Amino acid sequence: MLKVKRLEEFNTCYNSNQLEKMAFFQCREEVEKVKCFLEKNSGDQDSRSGHNEAKEVWSNADLTERMPVKSKRTSALAVDIPAPPAPFDHRIVTAKQGAVNSFYTVSKTEILGGGRFGQVHKCEETATGLKLAAKIIKTRGMKDKEEVKNEISVMNQLDHANLIQLYDAFESKNDIVLVMEYVDGGELFDRIIDESYNLTELDTILFMKQICEGIRHMHQMYILHLDLKPENILCVNRDAKQIKIIDFGLARRYKPREKLKVNFGTPEFLAPEVVNYDFVSFPTDMWSVGVIAYMLLSGLSPFLGDNDAETLNNILACRWDLEDEEFQDISEEAKEFISKLLIKEKSWRISASEALKHPWLSDHKLHSRLNAQKKKNRGSDAQDFVTK
């Protein structure tokens, strides 16, 4: 595989924003070229898939060389503490007609993020002083408004500590404002690319457990996220390992009898069925979970190419491996976990419930061993510092 850009350079290259890097594949010709290429070169496709065997587990609705983003990492002791719930009870929200400023003070200077939709500002409820986040979404017509109202409907159905919660909503002529739970830890993506942030396999386990718990809840509610990526996962604060999944703008209600197809998403996280414009379902999110696990463990993006076409090519060929030196000290359980998710045939991928039962996320003996190794590495690093 060709050497690819650093992930932070990739973001700039695609001229997109951290909270909403959408790539809408309206030009289907590029995908068709990739598919034609693969049909001619599919002889050894299965040997590249990163797994030798897999079984179908989706009957239950419960449900080339890559450039490293950073060097090898170690960190302080990780503590498995659940993410705190929102500072308010779950509520059913409908968009009110009127101005958000009548009830909230929206900061013009504290901008938390932004993208195709508009911007997210820090805000405060006037009556209570509750700190919140206001996502201001520009709406140019009825279609835009219906998309935002779908996001509201989705969030109304989701009540879980690892999913950001909706507090209020306001509709005016040119925009809809979603007032949401506020967290200040930044994006998980920032921790991947931050050279000063130390991340271990045990830290990754803590993140992945929470991601899978949030996705399991979504799937139990028959909702697909369809845009899972580190930019759409926020850390509760700067130091802890608790996370919350955000951005349900592309989420869809899954109805088994109604075959759903989508043609949106961020290229490097797309499942093969999205690239092929085939039917999507719960396993589509789990592919993205596999990509996130791969990135957290190694600092590498498994399918990222120099351009969209090359990235889609890699995805359709299911061309990935665990041979990079960044995986040298990673446990076999972690490698097996990834291999059960990055599978081209979606029915063979493990579900969120199965992922949480996998030894990598559930074996306390493994976690104790990784913790002991982390302490040993910390002591070794400290000794090296003293020697120098």
Curated annotation (Swiss-Prot):
The keyword Ribosomal protein does not apply. Residues 106-361 form the Protein kinase domain. The active site is at D227. This is Myosin light chain kinase family member 4. Changing H217L: In a lung squamous cell carcinoma sample; somatic mutation. It holds the Pfam family Pkinase. GO terms for biological process: signal transduction. CDD domains: STKc_MLCK4. InterPro entries: Kinase-like_dom_sf (IPR011009), Prot_kinase_dom (IPR000719), Protein_kinase_ATP_BS (IPR017441), Ser/Thr_kinase_AS (IPR008271). One of its GO terms (molecular function) is protein serine kinase activity. The lineage of its organism: Eukaryota, Metazoa, Chordata, Craniata, Vertebrata. It comes from the Eukaryota. Changing E30Q: In a breast infiltrating ductal carcinoma sample; somatic mutation. It is an enzyme of class 2 (transferase). PANTHER family: SERINE/THREONINE-PROTEIN KINASE. Its EC number is 2.7.11.1. Gene3D superfamilies: Phosphorylase Kinase, domain 1 (3.30.200.20), Transferase(Phosphotransferase) domain 1 (1.10.510.10).
